[in-house]
């Protein structure tokens, strides 16, 4: 009789509360559901630890298998699938208990990206955990992400918008990208993934097998015979479309879900101004009725688009919102920066965990290759010997901090762009409030001067050096001069 391995995590050991950090600072915390109390209800419980990993559940049926079920069996099956799509799924992964949100389960079990089956990895789990948290949080319109290139953000986003819209009646999903052409590409990817779904996951639609602008979940148009009575099917009356990048494209619409693709590369409009219009499509009175996801890669942020993206990022600072006494951020969004070290292709073990630090011995990767160094060492080595705009470009491609993600490449600058950006980052940490006051003598003999704040002061000071760095001077033939 199979038993749970002694080395496997017990449900009581599952960490429900997780932190989202920006550097060393906690941005916010989220809580995951309580795991199933009986270990035997968690998938893979009966497997040896080295065999425990994510695989599509054997309960998932092909369309042919589904059609062989009787009505009662088919109903029970769809109810189970619906439960997993909404409430999620639990499985053992190399001894650890892992939770898939409903959106994550749908993505892994059913969504195909260019015909490829996605695999589970820890950085994607965090992505979907944040998505779930924002879905449940009342005073939140959604969230924004900055990540490295080739992170699979488009596949995850299109999967989420499809899952959300097809679980609701009279729900509209909208997509915008940096241009109309790019929006069409994103929509085209969604359509291709939709076409690969088994028909039992394709709600009644308008009949267009390859829609180019809008995917409508409505009854196909048909003519009734003269004098005949039309009979209508029960349909979702929901839809997913994409529109041009202009700021008022969705003005006046009601959206259940909105996807903003590559907001950091959008130059046709100011993405912050566009978001201020779109967010009204997600609210009814004072109630938030829709959510949004905003993603961009750090590499190749356009000058104008990068600055607008930075403004949107800054307005999504929860700590600043708390200081102001607000219930939500100024933008209404939360934010997450994923360092390039996490989820980096080539540095993910066979169970889906990121190999950030150098392993003691080579580890088998999920791609079948051996991993001999961690992603942190790899990225550091790629930067060796590079400087100026070349190094800046490398940092933007694989950023380790949010400052590196927003670094200005400075291709036309004659100065060291890295040093300039370091100074910009430092200046950004300073208060922008000056203090009025006067410089007064503490001791004329030793030439010691102090600072006395007063509203009627003659001088305005933005920053003062540490006390032990003040009043440093040397005497020369002309008197005294500062060091």
For each predicted feature, which ranges?
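RNase H-like, metal-dependent nuclease domains and their acidic two-metal-ion catalytic environment used
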Residues: 2-8, 12-16, 30, 142, ...
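Structural recognition of the conserved hydrophobic beta-strand(s) that form the central parallel beta-sheet
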Residues: 241-242, 288-297
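Conserved Walker A/P-loop ATP-binding site and its immediately adjacent core
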Residues: 171-193
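Post-Walker A helix-loop "phosphate-sensing" segment adjacent to the P-loop in P-loop NTPases
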Residues: 164-171
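Short, conserved "post-DEAD/DEAH" coupling segment immediately C-terminal to helicase motif II
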Residues: 269-288
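Walker A/P-loop
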Residues: 138-161
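Conserved nucleotide-binding/hydrolysis micro-motifs of P-loop NTPases
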Residues: 180-182, 298-302, 342-345
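N-terminal accessory segments
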Residues: 1-141, 189-193, 200, 210, ...
